[in-house]
Amino acid sequence: MITLNGQNEGFSSVYKILTNQKVYKIYNQLSFASYHRRKLSDFRKIYDQTYKLNLSPRHKVISKNIIEIDELNSDHQLTIKKLFNDEKLLKIFLAQTRKINSIDKRIVKESLLNEIYSYIYHNPKYYKINQKIHQLKKYLKTYPQDFVCHGDLHLKNIYLKKNKIFFLDWDYCVLSSRGYDLAMFAYLEKLNEEQVNKLSIYSKISVKEIFHYLPICHLLDYLYLTIVSGRNDKKVKKLELEVDKFISNIH
């Protein structure tokens, strides 16, 4: 008998089929039609490169809305405490984030601005953001936007195997500043100032650059959650206040 363990992840659901040690990620077709997500076929070359570069397990696109992933079990659960208390492990993690930039930029194509625009495109709900799209573009370009980023770094997407780190879920892979990837990690894992400073020291990326992209992480989280949770969700309402303040103040 095939056993399925499922988990909903917004635009997609993830199923583990225990008979062949494979993980299947099934995408909601609405994410491509209504929210302008990139087609899975656009990721084939990215998946090939992440596997060859030892950044991730093998991914295989098997239909227009399903990918098959080789199951990867961590040696043990990675935690923020373990990551920041183990200097060697932190250096391995940051080296892997640098290695992401070895992916050919020509096959990534998507910019961080386009990622934002895919949510707000012709949507009257986001009128204020649309009105500031040129200022937003200028804000993003404060730092060079030519680094390949994972775009969704958090502990559930990071696996530790034989002192090697692998990343999962490349759906939000974009071209931006390297500070953006670390900002997203800091935002999603709620890092404190001391931990962000440590990231800065070991990565040689300024704290200023990392903090510069934190409002962008708030913005993306807000746009995503309004889709999957609705605007009446408590977290969405709190984020909306922060986003409104940020958008109002960019010039």
Feature annotation, model-predicted:
Residues 16-25, 56, 68, 159, ...:
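Short hydrophobic-acidic sequence motifs that mark active-site Asp/Glu residues
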Residues 29, 65-84, 102-105, 121-122, ...:
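A glycine-centered beta->alpha junction motif in the catalytic cores
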Residues 1-19:
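ATP-binding glycine-rich phosphate-binding loop
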Residues 97, 101-104, 203:
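Protein kinase-like catalytic domain
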Residues 13-17, 136-180:
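Active-site acidic catalytic loop and adjacent metal/ATP-binding pocket
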Residues 102-151, 161, 242:
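An alpha-helical support segment within catalytic cores of ATP-dependent transferases
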Residues 10-11, 23-63, 67, 76-99:
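A conserved alpha-helical element in kinase catalytic cores
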Residues 179-206, 215-233, 242-246:
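Active-site activation/catalytic loop segments of kinase-like enzymes and analogous catalytic loops
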